[in-house]
């Protein structure tokens, strides 16, 4: 925001140079990015009166002017402007002066044979405009020739370009900065005196259908205004702030926005009436419908989105609320009656609306950060007073829809002991000490806070009442402590390190993620990273304002990206891509947006990566069990016990070669071979396997094994007793179900169950397969005998025959 020092001095007592003020504000947190000293722009430029103007004898487009600049003898100046004439007041750059905005030193010159002693200036040459059609002509002034023109053009000013942090919405106004300067320097505030305007006729119809998005809307009708240029003082203040003057009505709304931080907007009432027809109009606030259009004040036709909040007249859009008005109701030189809008719009709503159509304005910037809801009426009365003073007119009607929730007073308890503990020692005039209670009371009082002591001890506690204009960023005790430190001055604190330090560490979730990535890399997978933005296909979460159509939606899974990457690598003859990705996915959930962290992986090709020599020159494709073993190795490294069951829900995976992964009764995800149809569409090799799992339940299973205290168990020094078990099982019966039944029946003596053979073919009953398991029995205190093992082994055999339709072969 651009801060005029002259304007600031009218609001607060200020005895600092611009450089000192800039340093003070920067140290206090309102960073001053640039100091623009305009006083040098018109140094040596004075007010001159053109006594006579004659045509140049040797040039058709030049004039020879005699100009009174307050010296004993008038100056002869050759001028090329078409609008120069006798008896006008103009700015004259005298001999020896320097115009920094055009890098021109004024010297005696001879133009086409005529001597010229100075230059009559345009606003462009003085740095006040980019282009100019001629010299600047002052209105009749009661000033002698030779007077400096700097004060007349606002060039006796210094501009500070400040960049407030996002939490300091109050600093986006001149009054807010004046309050800050008063708190920092102790200067006296001189805010403009504002008288309340009473309106007896309160029958202007206002309908707000979205009270959360628009808690307050006030419309005020002012009739009989006379639109014209604003006075010089108002135009100069607007120009200093970087705002182009338009006319007195519009300039007043912009001026109040800059002064109080409250956006306003003026509608031409007669144009509103023409737009809606002969019947009376009612103002309203609602969200846009898909496909609605509105031409805004910048003459751009906007296609509106459902996120856009609109101001309507009889339900017809007339403005994008809080962002920009509509061209159809613009105030111009023919306007006689206006409707003045003053409103509170929700910051989040305005931010979404602004982004949806890629349009930002001074109003939207302030609404996004939050305006002071308690000073809305102050800004309204200020605008009405200025408008009736500068444009005439009479306030005749008003309407208000006010559903503001009463926040009440924000009271926060502040402990001096806590403040001193956090801030530490400071350098005082008498040496090193603590911030005193008197310092705290002085600083917070200067900030506009009210203080009530709760105790009179050496370390008192105060009940601090926060002013309304700071309630958005001062919400807790720590915020008050920060304000005390900021205004006391960071340069007064002692330079010492904290005495008590705490060892840092990684959060459990981050430890789990690191362990997961290490486990995946440990089994030979390469980590890849894809964009989280994808091309939409129908069910994705769409972006409101995407940069490109190809990246206009949030991904719903990771596997699609891995499949595409696998196909690209294969097409480039880079071989099979054995890779994994950890990332976040998004989905629609009953109007809300859900999100979760996922792990996905893909593998295929030959299972031997060292070459084809061991297979006699023939590659050996990866089998389903090879890929499953790779996934199990990851889970084993993570200490998670995962069970497998049949599944055919994912259309990308082979329905007969897909497993549902579960851990502690919670579904993790799926693993399987890619569907043949998908492989043909992508041109992939036959043996490609993939998995995708949700990480939250996996992390929970990892907490004890990986993130908690390790559980060490010694190896048994005694040998295991091995037994084989072969059976015929139906094809739909999974190995996981058989394994679970054996583990449950075997109890503590059964150490391991491993499938070592599967056969389908001749001598196997139709619809079945032959499975062979190796069972290992072991304990840690002795060697098991046949008498220990045989009863338990028979118990397992009986459990299988009772629970499943299997036929034992051994």
Curated annotation (Swiss-Prot):
Names of the cofactor(s): Mg(2+)
EC number, UniProt record: 6.1.1.20
Domain of life where this protein originates: Bacteria
Molecular function, one GO term: phenylalanine-tRNA ligase activity
InterPro entries documented for this protein: aa-tRNA-synth_II/BPL/LPL, B3/B4_tRNA-bd, DNA-bd_dom_put_sf, Fdx_antiC-bd, Fdx_antiC-bd_sf, NA-bd_OB-fold, Phe-tRNA-ligase_IIc_bsu, Phe-tRNA-ligase_IIc_bsu_bact
Binding-site residues for Mg(2+), renumbered to this chain: 473, 479, 482-483
Subcellular compartments: Cytoplasm
Biological process (GO), any one: phenylalanyl-tRNA aminoacylation
Main localization (coarse): cytoplasm
Recorded GO CC terms: phenylalanine-tRNA ligase complex
Cofactor annotation remark: Binds 2 magnesium ions per tetramer.
Residues of the FDX-ACB domain: 716-809
tRNA-binding domain location: 39-150
Catalytic activity: tRNA(Phe) + L-phenylalanine + ATP = L-phenylalanyl-tRNA(Phe) + AMP + diphosphate + H(+)
Keyword ATP-binding: yes
Enzyme class: ligase
Domain (B5) ranges: 407-495
Keywords: Aminoacyl-tRNA synthetase, ATP-binding, Cytoplasm, Ligase, Magnesium, Metal-binding, Nucleotide-binding, Protein biosynthesis, RNA-binding, tRNA-binding
Assembly and oligomerization: Tetramer of two alpha and two beta subunits.
Record-stated family: Belongs to the phenylalanyl-tRNA synthetase beta subunit family. Type 1 subfamily.
UniProt-recorded name of the protein: Phenylalanine--tRNA ligase beta subunit
Organism this protein belongs to: Synechocystis sp. (strain ATCC 27184 / PCC 6803 / Kazusa)
């Amino acid at each position: 925001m651009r801060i005029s020092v002259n304007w600031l001095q009218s609001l607060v007592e200020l005895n600092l140079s611009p450089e000192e003020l800039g340093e003070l504000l920067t140290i206090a947190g309102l960073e001053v990015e640039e100091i623009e000293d305009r006083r040098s722009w018109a140094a040596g430029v004075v007010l001159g009166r053109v006594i006579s103007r004659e045509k140049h004898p040797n040039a058709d487009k030049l004039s020879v002017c005699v100009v009174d600049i307050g010296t004993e003898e008038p100056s002869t100046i050759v001028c090329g402007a078409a609008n120069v004439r006798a008896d006008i007041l103009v700015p004259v750059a005298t001999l020896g002066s320097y115009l920094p905005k055009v890098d021109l030193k004024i010297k005696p010159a001879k133009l086409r044979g005529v001597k010229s002693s100075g230059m009559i200036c345009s606003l462009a040459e003085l740095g006040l405009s980019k282009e100019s059609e001629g010299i600047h002509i002052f209105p009749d002034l009661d000033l002698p020739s030779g007077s400096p023109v700097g004060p007349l053009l606002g060039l006796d000013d210094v501009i500070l370009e400040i960049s407030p942090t996002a939490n300091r919405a109050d600093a986006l106004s001149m009054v807010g900065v004046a309050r800050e300067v008063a708190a920092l320097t102790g200067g006296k505030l001189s805010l403009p005196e504002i008288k309340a305007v009473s309106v007896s006729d309160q029958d202007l119809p206002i309908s707000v259908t979205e009270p959360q998005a628009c808690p307050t809307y006030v419309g005020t009708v002012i009739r009989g205004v006379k639109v014209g240029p604003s006075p010089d003082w108002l135009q100069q203040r607007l120009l200093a702030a970087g705002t182009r003057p338009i006319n007195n009505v519009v300039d007043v709304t912009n001026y109040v926005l800059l002064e109080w931080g409250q956006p306003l907007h003026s509608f031409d009432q007669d144009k509103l009436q023409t737009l809606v027809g002969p019947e009376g109009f009612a103002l309203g606030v609602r969200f846009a419908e898909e496909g609605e259009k509105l031409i805004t004040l910048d003459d751009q036709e906007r296609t509106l989105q459902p996120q856009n909040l609109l101001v309507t007249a009889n339900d017809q859009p007339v403005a994008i609320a809080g962002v920009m008005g509509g061209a159809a109701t613009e105030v111009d030189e023919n306007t006689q009656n206006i409707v003045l809008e003053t409103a509170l719009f929700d910051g989040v709503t305005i931010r979404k609306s602004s982004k949806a159509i890629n349009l930002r304005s001074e109003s939207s910037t302030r609404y996004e950060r939050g305006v002071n809801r308690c000073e809305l009426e102050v800004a309204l009365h200020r605008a009405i007073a200025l408008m009736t003073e500068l444009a005439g007119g009479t306030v005749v009607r008003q309407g208000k829809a006010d559903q503001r929730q009463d926040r009440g007073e924000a009271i926060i308890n502040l402990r001096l002991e806590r403040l001193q503990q956090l801030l530490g020692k400071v350098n005082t005039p008498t040496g090193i000490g603590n911030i005193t209670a008197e310092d705290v009371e002085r600083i917070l009082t200067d900030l506009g806070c009210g203080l009530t002591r709760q105790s009179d001890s050496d370390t008192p506690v105060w009940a601090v009442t926060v002013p309304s204009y700071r309630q958005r960023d001062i919400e807790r005790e720590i915020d008050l402590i920060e304000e005390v430190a900021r205004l006391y001055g960071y340069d007064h604190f002692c330079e010492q390190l904290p005495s008590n330090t705490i060892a840092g560490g990684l959060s459990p979730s981050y430890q789990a993620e690191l362990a997961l990535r290490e486990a995946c890399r440990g089994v030979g997978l390469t980590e890849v990273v894809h964009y989280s933005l994808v091309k939409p296909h129908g069910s994705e979460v769409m972006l409101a304002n995407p940069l490109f159509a190809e990246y206009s939606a949030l991904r719903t899974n990771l596997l699609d990206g891995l499949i595409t990457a696998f196909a690209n690598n294969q097409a480039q003859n880079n071989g099979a891509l054995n890779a994994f990705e950890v990332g976040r996915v998004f989905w629609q959930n009953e109007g809300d947006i859900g999100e979760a962290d996922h792990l996905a992986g893909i593998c295929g090709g030959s299972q031997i990566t060292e070459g084809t020599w061991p297979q006699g020159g023939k590659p050996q494709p990866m089998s389903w069990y090879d890929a499953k073993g790779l996934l199990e190795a990851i889970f084993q490294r993570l200490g998670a016990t995962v069970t497998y069951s049949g599944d055919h829900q994912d259309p990308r995976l082979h329905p007969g070669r897909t497993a549902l992964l579960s851990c502690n009764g919670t579904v993790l995800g799926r693993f399987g071979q890619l569907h043949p149809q998908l492989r043909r569409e992508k041109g992939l090799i036959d043996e490609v396997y993939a998995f995708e799992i949700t990480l939250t339940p996996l992390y929970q299973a990892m907490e004890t094994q990986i993130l908690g205290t390790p559980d060490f168990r010694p190896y048994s020094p005694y040998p295991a007793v091995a037994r084989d078990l072969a059976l015929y099982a139906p094809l739909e019966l999974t190995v996981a179900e058989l394994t679970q039944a054996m583990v449950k029946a075997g109890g503590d003596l059964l150490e391991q169950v491993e499938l070592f053979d599967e056969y389908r073919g001749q001598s196997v009953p139709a619809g079945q397969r032959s499975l062979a398991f190796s069972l290992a029995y072991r304990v840690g205190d002795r060697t098991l005998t046949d008498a220990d093992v045989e009863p338990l082994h028979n118990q397992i055999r009986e459990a299988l025959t009772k629970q499943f339709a299997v036929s034992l072969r051994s």
